[in-house]
Amino acid sequence: MTKGRVTQIMGPVVDVKFDNGHLPAIYNALKISHKPSSASEVAIELTLEVAIHLGDNTVRTVAMSSTDGLVRGLEVEDTGAAISVPVGDVTLGRVFNVLGEKIDLDAPIDAGARRDPIHRQAPKFENLSTQAEILETGIKVVDLLAPYIKGGKIGLFGGAGVGKTVLIQELINNIAQEHGGISVFAGVGERTREGNDLYHEMTDSGVIKKTAMVFGQMNEPPGARQRVALTGLTMAEYFRDEQGQDVLFFIDNIFRFTQAGSEVSALLGRMPSAVGYQPTLATEMGQLQERITSTSVGSVTSIQAIYVPADDYTDPAPATTFAHLDATTNLERKLSEMGIYPAVDPLASTSRALSPEIVGEEHYAIARQVQQTLQRYKELQDIIAILGMDELSDEDKLVVQRARRVQFFLSQNFHVAEQFTGQKGSYVPVKETVKGFKEILEGKYDHLPEDAFRLVGRIEEVIENAKRMGVEV
């Protein structure tokens, strides 16, 4: 007998008591199917996931959808296995929820399709791949100063409204189209509108045919938001392990995964730790991140947007994520206020790949020179604010002049923002990026006005802008 009854309901957390000595294992999926017997009742189809054994044949579970209409005494059935989701080619071009149920308007998924459990072990050490190859994004500031690694983990950090989602959409646009391989997108606790926009953009561009999408958005209960990243990851792992593909895995937003965990943590009876987060924060993050990796068979390159609460990088949620990443792209509010987009902080963003062995001597030297110039400009800003430009030495004046040109040249227009800006987006190959910054630092364009460098792609566009401004080039 694998049936039990609901004994207690605390929002998204439900206690279930089983009789006859049966006890479902941790992570097992339990199902509640209730047909209404009167007009005042509602039909209930609900999946619960076992989180804790309380003793006395009772388990504490987390609901994967709304618990509205649930009452004590309802019958619950143990499925005998963890939540499993469809994997393989049937997922491409489709949109799913946390349980692997289709939420688009297309035909139902074939009942015979392979399904894999969302909980599994990370790959073994001996199977991991260690090669480093650069992934070109076409975004100058990223490719020059904090390049991404194929098969690596990349984090886009930023507070509210500085452009994380736009950046991740541009990366999907640039990389998914250039890369031509398979992509998986997991929308974790973000706006449904953004997911809808993304789906339609991908449909228009044709990328959707090679993409699987899973969503557990802001309006979903915390159980769904906590597990939806694992649903997407399970789909990506199949393409990596069974088909040997190089998969792109996008997550927007990994902070909401942590946030969902903290919402249910107190209800599950755990003592909160720093800033009210769950005490198991590092473990949960590790279990997810260690599975996102590249093996000798195939690779998963993951790009994760990470919300930084109140712009505080020492908050436990972003701080715990930092440790797992190969490259970080930090978005800075001050830059977005100056109208420099993407608002990537060139001094705070880091990458393991920025070394002469991986990017080459010239690229490395130019990147370091750009950072030194911007760092010196940052140091001089206090002097300029108090005494003005006239008090600087000629050498420092030149540094400031070039630094401002470099700062503006790090900005560019995005394809995904064309409908808002009316400007065409630009994709800049790494070689062109390095060439442009090299020429600026050599002083080749000192005579051109600063504004000519704003929101352009290649260095040739700067010259065209200057001509339009009536400057002798």
UniProtKB/Swiss-Prot annotation:
Predominant subcellular localization, coarse grouping: membrane
Pfam families, A to Z: ATP-synt_ab (PF00006), ATP-synt_ab_N (PF02874), ATP-synt_VA_C (PF22919)
InterPro entries in alphabetical order: AAA+_ATPase, ATP-synt_VA_C, ATP_synth_F1_bsu, ATPase_a/bsu_AS, ATPase_alpha/beta_chains, ATPase_F1/V1/A1_a/bsu_N, ATPase_F1/V1/A1_a/bsu_N_sf, ATPase_F1/V1/A1_a/bsu_nucl-bd
Keyword Cell membrane: yes
Membrane topology of the entry: Peripheral membrane protein
Binding site for ATP: 158-165
Top-rank EC class of the record's enzyme: translocase
A GO cellular component annotation in the UniProt record: proton-transporting ATP synthase complex
Molecular function as annotated in GO: ATP binding; ATP hydrolysis activity; proton-transporting ATP synthase activity, rotational mechanism
Function recorded in the entry: Produces ATP from ADP in the presence of a proton gradient across the membrane. The catalytic sites are hosted primarily by the beta subunits.
Quaternary state and interactors: F-type ATPases have 2 components, CF(1) - the catalytic core - and CF(0) - the membrane proton channel. CF(1) has five subunits: alpha(3), beta(3), gamma(1), delta(1), epsilon(1). CF(0) has three main subunits: a(1), b(2) and c(9-12). The alpha and beta chains form an alternating ring which encloses part of the gamma chain. CF(1) is attached to CF(0) by a central stalk formed by the gamma and epsilon chains, while a peripheral stalk is formed by the delta and b chains.
Family membership: Belongs to the ATPase alpha/beta chains family.
Protein known as: ATP synthase subunit beta
Organism: Priestia megaterium (strain ATCC 12872 / QMB1551) (Bacillus megaterium)
Phylogenetic classification of the source organism: Bacteria, Bacillati, Bacillota, Bacilli, Bacillales
